[in-house]
Structure formats: structure tokens, C-alpha cells
Amino acid sequence: MNTYELISSLKIKQQIGKLPNTISSISHNSRQVDDNSLFICISGFTVDGHNFVAEAVENGATCIVAEREVNLDTNKATLIIVPDTNKAIATLAATFYKHPSHNLTIYGVTGTNGKTTVTTIINHLLTDNELSTALIGTNGFQINKDIYSSSNNTTSDVLTNQHMLYEAKNQGVTHVAMEVSSHGLEQGRLWGIDFTVATFTNLSHEHLDYHGSMEEYAATKVQLFSSLAIQPNKQKIAVLNRDDNWYEYFQKRTPVQIVSYGIYEQADFRATAIKYYKDRTSFELLTPEGSFQVQTKLMGEFNVYNVLAAIASVYVKESIPLTDLVKSIEGTPTPPGRMEKLESSGNRHIYIDYAHTPDALTKAINSLLPFKQNKLIVVVGTGGDRDKSIRPLLAKAASVADYVILTINDPRHEDPNNILQDLENGMLHHQYTCLENRKEAIREAINYSSPNDIILIAGKGKEPYQIIKNKKVAHNDATIALECSNELFPNI
């Protein structure tokens, strides 16, 4: 790309050296730089890109964007100094990839819980009604039904996001469903993306180690909505959960058309006459266009909210007949690792769920309680080097179960015994055990169980690894549960 065109939107404080004519790529990782690249120095939580300029130049960078002067041979590379490289990288990424979001309908979904399920349902509704789609979030990057990459974060970095949108647009995609995390918003990973529809699921206790308070957490989440009017080139719509305690906070800070959904409060899209079954949920959908009978394979009240959010989001933008959307809902698959029931031996009912917050765990357990014939056994853990205040609340939520196994999701660098002790502090009864090894915890749950027991393995969903210190160690809850079940009950 022409270098002058690329940097034209930057706020440049100083330029040292002659600009190269063209730039072949952009990177903030000095190890991924190639010939004729632009390297941008980002100050992260653990490393500072300004310290890796020499390596970037050695690998082929011909232009360096930084916040301060660095040791650089300007005969080899040009130095551009800007006030804020986090904002600069968003501008550069959008420009380099030719602002793909301007020509896409992008659904952004944020909230503490439900982002993956709602984006999955939105994606299904769109593809089922013959629209070309991309899905971006916790489970990776998908165009139509082809999976292109996995993801380490709910919201990828700004360069990756723009590149994914660029690839999607080039492959004929017209609509994108995208998860939007609070970290992604706070760290500017979504700057430069022109969202069309913003959907709010709910807000509850999470990430307070990072945000400090629920008020700061909400202020970060609401950025998705307050920024909708910045790009006036599209009709923008916000879809809000009328039943959530933070509804009015989001409503007051949203400068575009608002559509509401809910169960208990009056809303534009409302579910009533809800019936829960072992393998499905049904309800009557009340809308401005009349009422419709909805059937879904998804379980629990929280999934009724997820279905409502998705239907409202798609209908208000696409005007697809509600009869068609309701029909499509019947075929919506359960997202992997989201209240996913395993086909296991031993006549045990084993569910894998990503629930890793007190609110999500409570809702997952409540969705199973009506079908409890014998015992409910819950495996619950939490991660190291993360919000400690959430730990006793998770154990308290799990205490509804007949037997609880406390374990660890991703210990990272923290002492596992400290994590387990924090969890124990929230237990309300003595029918529990602590097992540091997550595989052993899953095995204990299955071994302790009897026929017709329900086993909920919560916290990691479909994640294929555990983070132990700096290493990712292969681990998948569903795979381990099936292995243990088949080993313990081979002939049942």
C-alpha cells in the first residue's frame, strides 16, 4: 500500500527519515515482521514494543511508528512519532484493509454472559435465510460454515479483527456476527469497526480485578452503544435486555433507535408461556407484528433470553419475516461447550458448560434442577491470576448441588492451593471435595455418580487446553468426561 495514503489519517508529532514508497504489511510483533513492513510499538501489560525496534528492523521493517524516540538507524527505517500508538494502530489497520466494516452489516454482541450463544444464533438465522455470513468470537473465525481459525480471546487484537473483516468481505460475506468483550472495548481492539446493530445481553459480576467496579465495567460495555452514532452512514440499532438491572443505564447512553426484549418486563420482543423440557424449550413470542410459537433445542431461561436477543437483532435490521425466523430457531444447534449434553455411557446425564461467573453458573444449574431425578453433581473451578472476589461466589452458587468438586480452570502462575481455599470459603455445605487436577475432578464426579444423576462440568466449555504457568497443556472437558465414562461404565 502507498505509505503516504496509509499514514494520512495519523496525528503525527514528528517524522525522522524518508518514508518508503510502499508498505507490504503491518505488525505489532517484531517476530512477525517481514520485508518492507510497518512495525508499530505497543506498550502492553508485560512487554513494551519500543524495546523490540532493532529486531523489527532486522526482520525487514522499513517504517516504525512509536510514541517516543527510539534507537534507530534512519537509513534503514523511518521513525514516525504519534501521541498514542493504540489509537494509531486502529487507524492504520482500518486504512490498510480499506475499511471493510463500512460495507458490511455487523452485529456486535456484548454482555457478561451469552455472547457466544447469541452470535451463534444470529449467524444461524442469517445463513438459514440465505445471507452470506462470518462469525467472530470465542470459538474463532468462521465464514459461512467453514472455520478458518481458533481464538485465544473473545475479541482479537485490532489488526486481526480488521484482517478478518477484510477476508470476509473478499469472500462475498455481507453480514458479520461478532462477540464484543469489555477487554476488547477498553483496549481499543474494536476501534475503527463500524457496527450496525449492537446487542446487550446482561451485566453481572466479572472482571472486577481489571475494571475495578461494576460501574467501571458498565461504562466500558456501554462504549459499544454510545459510539453507534459516530459513523452516520448506516441505520444503527441497539437491542437491549429490558429485564436486566442495567437496562436504564444503557438506554440513557444509547443515541440511536432502541429495541427491547425480555420476559418479565414489557418489551418489544417478549417471551411468555415458557415451557421447559429435557431436550427443548418452547414459548410464545409476543412482538409488534403479533404472536408466534417458538421451539428451540436450547435449554433454560437464560437461553430464552439468548433466542429473544438474536431474533430481535436480526428482525429489526433485516425485516426477515418472523415466521421464517421462528422456523429457523427450531434448527439452531447448541454451541459447543454451552449446555452441551454428552452422549455418554452409564446412563448419566453429563453437561459441559462454559459458565465461569456466579450468575452464569446459577442459571446453568437452575436450568437442570427441574429434571433432577437423583443427584446433581457439579464440577466447578476458576482461574489463577484473575478476579479473586468471584471465587467464593462461584462456590456459593454451586452449593445448590448435592455434591460439588472444586477444581481449577487455568492455574496460570498462581498457587493452586490458594485458588481452592478461596473457592472453599464460599461453600455452604460439606458435601464437596477439592481436587487440583481438573481431569481427576471430572473423574471423581463421574465415579461418584449413580444412574440418572446429572453431572454439570462448568468453567471451560469447549476450550482445548489449560494454561499452566506459561504453557498451554492439552485438556478438553468433554473428551475427558467421555473417556472416564467409557472406562468406568464400559458395558452400560
Swiss-Prot record:
Record GO terms (molecular function): acid-amino acid ligase activity; ATP binding; magnesium ion binding
Record key words, sorted: ATP-binding, Cell cycle, Cell division, Cell shape, Cell wall biogenesis/degradation, Cytoplasm, Ligase, Nucleotide-binding, Peptidoglycan synthesis
UniProt GO cellular component terms: cytoplasm
PTM section of the record: Carboxylation is probably crucial for Mg(2+) binding and, consequently, for the gamma-phosphate positioning of ATP.
Domain of life: Bacteria
Pathway(s) served: Cell wall biogenesis; peptidoglycan biosynthesis
Location relative to the cell: Cytoplasm
One Pfam family, short name: Mur_ligase_M
Main localization, broad class: cytoplasm
PTM annotation (N6-carboxylysine): residues: K221
Keyword Cell wall biogenesis/degradation applies: yes
Keyword Cell division: yes
EC main group: ligase
Residues involved in ATP binding: G111, T112, N113, G114, K115, T116, T117
EC number, UniProt record: 6.3.2.-
Annotated binding of UDP-N-acetyl-alpha-D-muramoyl-L-alanyl-D-glutamate, by residue: S30, T154, T155, S181, Q187, R189
GO BP annotations listed: cell division; cell wall organization; peptidoglycan biosynthetic process; regulation of cell shape
UniProt cross-references to InterPro entries, sorted A to Z: Mur-like_cat_sf, Mur_ligase_C, Mur_ligase_C_dom_sf, Mur_ligase_cen, Mur_ligase_N, MurE/MurF_N, UDP-N-AcMur-Glu-dNH2Pim_ligase
PANTHER family referenced in this protein's UniProt entry, alphabetically: MUR LIGASE FAMILY MEMBER, UDP-N-ACETYLMURAMOYL-L-ALANYL-D-GLUTAMATE--2,6-DIAMINOPIMELATE LIGASE MURE HOMOLOG, CHLOROPLASTIC
Physiological role: Catalyzes the addition of an amino acid to the nucleotide precursor UDP-N-acetylmuramoyl-L-alanyl-D-glutamate (UMAG) in the biosynthesis of bacterial cell-wall peptidoglycan.
Family: Belongs to the MurCDEF family. MurE subfamily.
Family matches, as NCBIfam families: murE (TIGR01085), PRK00139.1-4 (NF001126)
HAMAP family noted in UniProt: MurE
Name of the protein in question: UDP-N-acetylmuramyl-tripeptide synthetase 2
